[in-house]
Amino acid sequence: MKNYIVSLSKRALLLSGALAIFTACDDGDLGDIYKGNSSGEYVSDVNWTDAADKSTGTYIKYFYENASGRDTFCGSIYWEKPNTPETGEPASTGGSGGWSQGHALDIVIDAYIRHANNPEYQAHLYENIMKPFLPAFDDWNEHCGYGGKDFWNNFYDDMEWMALSCLRVYELTGDQDYYSALMKMWNHIKGAKNDYKGVGGMAWKTDAPASRMSCSNGPGCLLAMKLYQLTVKEAKDGWEEQAAYYLNFAKEVYNWMTAYLCDISTGQVYDNLSIKDDGTPGDPDKIGRAHV
């Protein structure tokens, strides 16, 4: 097996691949990819599939590159810059950031979906990235400093992002290892809905029960909804009761979040709040976030 490492740049993730598109192309390519008329009604001649593929190719090159001494992927984030294989410098194995590992996998999943008519390329992504990623992520998570066994992580949102990605892989490939990982994470995640002082919502961290953040409530609600849909679709023994549980979980979190961490008149999503000692929600930090 080849040696790989995941080394994710915070900027690259926050810009959702925009910078990666530019680094994927030399100056001669940019004019061919980005065309359009900015006056009047915007019409674009961009081939977005081509642009996405170029971005994904660059992403895989820089963030899933070989790392000496590693026999699997290693989820390890280097916050300030990506690896630069062409320089001959070794890939970074330092840093930590579990929240971005699910996003790393999502980029590969999106490429897998785009190429539904190219089974050879899909097989390449599945065999060379998806399959080795999961056990390596499990190993990294256990030793990252704030994780543990069975995909447990002190940050609920880290587990939620990864669980959402695992669910996507399972739905696309039927990989039972990903389903098992998904359910292990869900068993941890559901504890975030701790009803601390009877207030509701989902905590941000396991050791901060009064914490309430959009990044834990938004994806937590979404995960419960997707588990509801999956349970209904598969209709396994006893599915009705389990589906009802997921649906009720999602509704309760949604109702709480829209009441306390959103301005539904504008669509603004607040960052966080804390539950006060008297059991009332504190004032939210109204810095806008895009977690839902």
Task: Give, region by region, the residue ranges found by the protein language model.
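Aromatic- and glycine-enriched pocket-lining scaffold segments that form the walls
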Residues: Q176-W256
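Conserved small/polar residues in nucleotide/adenosyl-binding loops
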Residues: I287-V292
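Bacterial N-terminal signal peptides that target proteins for export
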Residues: K2-L13
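C-terminal motif of bacterial Sec signal peptides marking the signal peptidase cleavage site
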Residues: I21-A24
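Well-ordered alpha-helical scaffold segments within catalytic/enzyme domains
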Residues: G40-V43, G102-Y121, W161-D175, P219-W239
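Low-complexity, Ser/Thr/Pro/Gly-enriched N-terminal "stalk/linker" regions
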Residues: D26-K149, Q176-V199, I264
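Catalytic cores of carbohydrate-active enzymes
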Residues: W239-Q242, Y246-D285
